[in-house]
Regions:
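Disorder-to-helix initiation segments
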Residues: 1-13
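Short, charged, amphipathic alpha-helical segments
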Residues: 43-53
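Helix-adjacent hinge/juxtasegments
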Residues: 58, 62-87
Length: 134
């Protein structure tokens, strides 16, 4: 029974990672809107960073726990494939989702980085204009 509990924990940690990556992706969309909005405040931008930072920390914790448990149950999964066929298939599907979401998040991060560079370049130009006019 303990082995089945470990396998369930593995699956649940992958499900949680999918959930967290979806949250990060949604927050990236919010961050993109904030960066594109000339009236957005620095606090709004910082809130998106803070949210993502928390979720990234949660993912790191999940990954560490997953690795530790996987090492314990890897032989079991290899030796009893028929017994765990459904769980293995579900976990493979979750890993595919995680890969797709990770790729999506990385793309969003690159796009937001470019938006941030543009926004901060505009802020610098405004600051220079103000200094010159004084």
């Amino acid at each position: 029974m303990q082995d089945e509990a470990y396998v369930k924990i593995l699956r649940e940690s992958l499900e949680k990672k999918v959930e967290l990556l979806n949250l990060i992706s949604n927050e990236n969309e919010i961050q993109s809107r904030v960066l594109s909005d000339p009236n957005a405040t620095p606090d709004e931008f910082q809130a998106t960073i803070d949210n993502k930072d928390k979720w990234i920390t949660d993912i790191s914790t999940l990954d560490n726990g997953f690795s530790a448990i996987f090492e314990k149950v890897k032989p079991l999964l290899e030796n009893q494939k028929p017994k765990y066929r459904d769980e293995i298939a579900r976990m493979k599907d979750l890993v595919r989702q995680i890969t797709d979401l990770t790729t999506q998040v990385e793309k969003q991060e690159k796009e937001n980085y470019l938006l941030a560079q543009q926004k901060f370049a505009g802020v610098r130009k405004q600051a220079q204009k103000i200094r010159k006019s004084q």
